[in-house]
Every structure is written in C-alpha cells, then in structure tokens.
Amino acid sequence: IEMNCRGSNIIERVFRDVNPTPYISLFIDGCMEKGRDVMAGGAVLYEGLGTIFAGLATYADSMAAVRRLVYEDKKYTLPELITALDADFDGYDDIRRDCLQAAKYGNDCDEADFIARDIIDYTEQKMNSYPSLYARHIHGTLSQSFNTPLGAMIGATPDGRKAGKPLSDGMSPSQGMDKKGPTAIIKSVSKLNVESMSLGMAHNFKLLPRFLETAEGQHAVISLLKTASLLGNGQMQFNCVDNETLRAAQQHPGQYRDLIVRV
C-alpha cells in the first residue's frame, strides 16, 4: 500500500505538470476562484488519486480457509498447505476439496464476510494515512475487468482457486461460490462498510434471462433491489445474459452489436 501511494504521488506530479485539464476545471468548485487547475490542487474538495482493488472475495475466502483448516481445526500445517498451492493442488485433491468447502463470502456467513469487511476497512485506513499532494489517498472495490489478467499472473490460492484463474470481481462473491441465493449475497455485501470505499464500489449481479420473463421473476428482482437498499448496499449492477449468448457473440460479434455486459 505504501509503495502504491508513493507511485500515485509521482503520477499526481506528472499530471500537474504535463496533463492539465482546463475544461474539466471549469466545472470543479474552487478552480476558477483559485486560478488553479484541478490537477494542481484547485478544487475545494480534493480526494487525490485513488486505487481500485480486485480479488476481495478471493482474499476473504482464502483467509477463512487458512484460519479454519490450519489454525482452528489444525487439519493441515501451513507448510503442507503452501506445498499444495505451489503444486496447483496437483496430487492434493483432498486439501483442495477442504479449501473449497470452507466458508465463502456471499453466503451470509460471518466467518468469511467479516474478513472481507475488515480488509476493506484496513485498506482505506492505511491509504488515508499516506498524504497525497493535495489531500489523502483513497481506494475502491471495483475491479472493472482486470481481475482476469491479474488472476492469470497469480498462483493457486487457499480458497481452492487454481493457478491462472480469474480473481473475484468487485464486491461480488468468487465465481460459483455463492450457494445460498441472491438474498444471502446482498446480506453479505451489506456487512461491508461503504464509507471505507471512498473511490466507489461495484457489485456485479448475474441473472439468467428467463428469470425476468415472468411477472413473478420481475417482482422478485424489484424486491431484491428494495431489500438491498434497505440494508445499505452501496451499488448493484446486473448482467442478464446466458452463456450460450456470450459464446455466440464471441463467434459472431457482428450479430450482437446491441449486447452490453457490465464488468
């Protein structure tokens, strides 16, 4: 985190000196009054540069598995688990099965959900402790699509994820790990402190198209949104497309020009 903040300060200096934004500055309170570009600290409220993080659920699920299997149940030693990870679980099917069966964020399970909450709070507090040129450093949990290339560079993880596979995206559960339905997902997300994600957050929610083909399904989605709002969830965005459509779009992109997928 410290290295990231130092790098951001260098970027701020470069932006200030070689990349002013006079047009944007016209619409930012304080810039006209001070006669300073927003990149040079002209804004009345200036948060500074932010950092977006990927792999929240991957981290939470991994730490939950380590705590349960190594420290609480003492089923494996830490060196044994590391050996299995280094081997990408090849020859360690039993260890991987136990890792996959450990608590997972997104199932309204405090064991994993509170780890996700704690790492978000810690990250924001730690970043706030490093000054930027004009304010403070902040972070957000909205991985956009870089959770996939990052995952390609990272080995196996204690949540049971194999080497090279995508990390989890945004505030969403790890792929395929939400087992208890949409209500459990939003209850897990509601435990996160949205005020600790000053740069923003993204919760990608996947729905099958047939779910919205009936009035009952449509009302269920409306109820889900209302419940999420009441629980204090900061953000939700929906993908409503099936795998067959996505594969067809890859093969024949010209036929699917109106297809929009949130990432």
Give the role of each language-model region:
Residues I1-V263:
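Acidic, glycine-enriched catalytic cores built around paired aspartates
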